[in-house]
Amino acid sequence: MSLLTEVETPIRNEWECRCSDSSDPLVIAASIIGILHLILWILDRLLFKFIYRRFKYGLKRGPSMEGVPESMREEYRQEQQSAVDVDDSHFVNIELE
């Protein structure tokens, strides 16, 4: 006798969905939550660069320039640029023992 004859094979009827009571409110709620979760996950993966960049950099804007004379605006921009230039030329050397 072969081992293949002793293995139980599922009948096609067992593979079919037995969701005859799909009008159950819990099943409907779970389906809606699952679909919404899938949609939000897809949107997150498609737009994550824009969303997280907005949170990371959008909230760190400089002070408002309303009512500030143009000469002071230019002075502020130059200070900010010089601070960036100093940071770009600064390197940290780490020596491992």
Swiss-Prot record:
It is found in: Virion membrane; Host apical cell membrane. The record marks 41 as: Seems to be involved in pH gating. The M2 protein from most influenza A strains is inhibited by amantadine and rimantadine, resulting in viral uncoating incapacity. Emergence of amantadine-resistant variants is usually rapid. The keyword Chaperone does not apply. Forms a proton-selective ion channel that is necessary for the efficient release of the viral genome during virus entry. After attaching to the cell surface, the virion enters the cell by endocytosis. Acidification of the endosome triggers M2 ion channel activity. Belongs to the influenza viruses matrix protein M2 family. This is Matrix protein 2.
